[in-house]
């Protein structure tokens, strides 16, 4: 698999850089404050790409409910956040972009979630790898990124999608009749696992990765 001249830009920020909780606020208020802080940060980044002041009112939803900029259809974007990190993926050249980020120190019921969400092929690989945590995070973030890219989200059961994540590869292709073909690339950073996905068609010429540029703020 080789690189193309198509690009995906990824911005990663620590949540503590964009949000400081109000200690006097109750939990539900803090969650709402975090949501608004994330939206402001997203809008600021999108404004920089487009040289236009993006507001919440500019963000609409496509027929599948995926957030988009109807006034700027040339820019595809998707975002994700964990407890500690925020990530925004954007591209002017690729369609149906999706992203997921997970903290590697997240407390996870690995086996229970794998039994519930993994395709039988993924579950077998994970068991053969003696429940390797990195492989689990790669499968999980790939599922999330692909389903977010497709726009279907939870309308397609996680265990119906076989991502074909391979232990020795950092990306690949997957397909499901409901969503079509998607490609993805995994990035393991010291504190988090990040996966970017985008719509891709199989070709006799072979598959090519776009240039994915990650900026950590």
Predicted regions and their residues:
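Core catalytic alpha/beta fold that binds nucleotide/phospho-ligands
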Residues: 1-217
């Amino acid at each position: 698999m080789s690189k193309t001249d198509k690009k995906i830009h990824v911005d990663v920020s620590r949540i503590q850089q964009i949000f400081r909780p109000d200690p006097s606020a109750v939990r539900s208020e803090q969650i709402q404050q975090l949501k608004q802080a994330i939206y402001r940060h997203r809008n600021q980044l999108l404004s920089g790409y487009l040289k236009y002041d993006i507001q919440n009112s500019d963000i609409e939803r496509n027929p599948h409910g995926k957030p988009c900029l109807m006034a700027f259809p040339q820019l595809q974007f998707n975002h994700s956040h964990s407890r500690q990190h925020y990530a925004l993926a954007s591209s002017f050249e690729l369609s149906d972009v999706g992203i997921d980020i997970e903290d590697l120190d997240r407390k996870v019921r690995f086996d229970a979630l794998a039994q519930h969400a993994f395709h039988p092929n993924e579950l077998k690989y994970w068991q053969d790898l003696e429940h390797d945590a990195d492989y689990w995070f790669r499968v999980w973030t790939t599922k999330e990124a692909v389903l977010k890219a497709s726009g279907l989200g939870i309308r397609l059961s996680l265990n119906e999608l076989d991502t074909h994540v391979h232990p020795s590869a950092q990306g690949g292709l997957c397909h499901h009749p409901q969503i079509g073909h998607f490609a993805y690339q995994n990035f393991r950073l010291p504190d988090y696992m990040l996966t970017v996905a985008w719509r891709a068609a199989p070709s006799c010429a072979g598959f090519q990765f776009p240039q994915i540029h990650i900026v950590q703020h």
